[in-house]
């Protein structure tokens, strides 16, 4: 398959791995964070850690939108779903994330709440059209990749004159989280040291490579945008190793077949018409971050579920035994959590990092648990 098979060639992968091993300075460490949850799974799926020298360490970041959703926002969604006359719909992973008291949207549905799973925001619009006597609320989550489809359905709802459709907006912004990672207590104390970023793929197709320019300039941290295939990731790692060896800190784009400097201008314009920055938004593991999320503009306030239903902010309590917040900051790995594997598993998730298909714990469970000893050496 074009643009797939040629990026999975085993011989080329071994050559790239050999170059990384040859060029990595044995006298120093290379601590590199992949921000994207899709990258995390690709790294384990293709056994990338097993190909790297011991001093090239991969650290998982907060690039999973389900994982970074704070419990308080999930509590608000559950409260909304339980209201008479409301149908709440969202993506499948969100249904299983435990909120306060280990209640999830799935459990709320079992107790009688009208909760629906969907694959696309357009399904929520259709649901509102088919149920004119019910208030249909789309629980919107995700980074810049999933924001334009939400903006589109809000615009369409206004055009159609739908009065029973609204959006509970929880769209968050990638650069803000990356800034926060470099300013966490662990980073300030030196217990979390990051030498470079593997930039996200899908997000970068929307926001473009220019969006990351502040990181080398402000923090001296290099960043290489990478695709999802094994050769993409290995080439990006080699590019980061070379930048660090040469004392450079730049934004480089390995994923040139999909990412441009300016990104998707139409998608960004659509997002800008419908949404504006929130002053602050709570992230699981990172706390309240300024200008890190979006809200619906006043011109589209009738489609804002928070305004329509006068939702009040909540502060949920984390499971104290769950290390998901520290894992999202890159301060710990899944194997550091005493709940990992037993009792916490994809069938019985106790934290969001095990629920989502993009979560670090789910990746470890699916691909890495049987190789923990090997991966531990690489770390």
Curated annotation (Swiss-Prot):
GO BP: protein maturation
Record keyword Metal-binding present: yes
Binding site for Fe cation: 36, 64, 67
Pathway: Protein modification; [NiFe] hydrogenase maturation
Cofactor(s) demanded: [4Fe-4S] cluster
Keywords (A to Z) from UniProt: 4Fe-4S, Iron, Iron-sulfur, Metal-binding
One term of GO molecular function: carbon monoxide binding
Family of the protein in this entry: Belongs to the HypD family.
Function summary: Involved in the maturation of [NiFe] hydrogenases. Involved in the biosynthesis of the Fe(CN)(2)CO cofactor.
Stored NCBIfam families: hypD
Protein name according to UniProt: Hydrogenase maturation factor HypD
The organism of origin for this protein: Azotobacter vinelandii
């Amino acid at each position: 398959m074009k643009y797939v098979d040629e990026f999975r060639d085993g011989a080329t992968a071994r050559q790239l791995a050999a170059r990384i091993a040859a060029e990595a300075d044995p006298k120093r460490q290379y601590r590199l964070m992949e921000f994207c949850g899709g990258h995390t799974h690709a790294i384990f799926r293709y056994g990338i850690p097993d190909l790297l020298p011991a001093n090239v360490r991969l650290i998982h970041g907060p690039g999973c939108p389900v994982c970074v959703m704070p419990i308080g926002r999930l509590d608000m969604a559950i409260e909304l779903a339980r209201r008479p006359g409301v149908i709440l719909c969202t993506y499948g992973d969100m249904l299983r994330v435990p909120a306060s008291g280990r209640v999830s949207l799935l459990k709320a549905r079992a107790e009688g709440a009208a909760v629906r799973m969907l694959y696309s925001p357009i399904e929520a619009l259709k649901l509102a059209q088919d149920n004119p006597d019910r208030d249909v609320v789309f629980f919107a989550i995700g980074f810049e990749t999933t924001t334009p489809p939400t903006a589109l359905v809000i615009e369409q709802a206004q055009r159609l004159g739908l009065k029973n459709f609204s959006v509970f907006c929880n769209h968050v912004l990638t650069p803000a989280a990356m800034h926060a990672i470099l300013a966490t207590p662990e980073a300030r104390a030196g217990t979390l040291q990051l030498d470079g970023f593997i930039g996200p793929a899908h997000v970068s197709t929307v926001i473009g490579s220019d969006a990351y320019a502040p990181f080398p300039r402000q923090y001296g941290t290099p960043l290489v945008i990478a695709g999802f295939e094994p050769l993409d990731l290995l080439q990006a790692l080699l590019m980061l190793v070379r930048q660090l060896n040469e004392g450079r800190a730049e934004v480089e784009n390995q994923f040139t077949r999909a990412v441009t400097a300016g990104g998707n201008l139409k998608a960004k314009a659509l997002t800008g018409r419908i949404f504006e920055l929130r002053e602050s938004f709570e992230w699981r593991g990172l706390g309240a971050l300024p200008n890190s999320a979006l809200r619906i503009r006043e011109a589209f306030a009738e489609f804002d579920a928070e305004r329509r239903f006068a939702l009040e902010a909540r502060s949920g309590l984390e499971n104290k035994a769950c290390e998901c917040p520290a894992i999202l900051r890159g301060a710990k790995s899944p194997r550091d959590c005493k709940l990992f594997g037993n009792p916490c598993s994809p069938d019985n998730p106790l934290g969001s990092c095990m629920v989502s298909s993009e979560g670090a714990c789910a990746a470890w469970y699916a691909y890495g648990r049987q190789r923990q000893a090997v991966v531990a050496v690489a770390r």
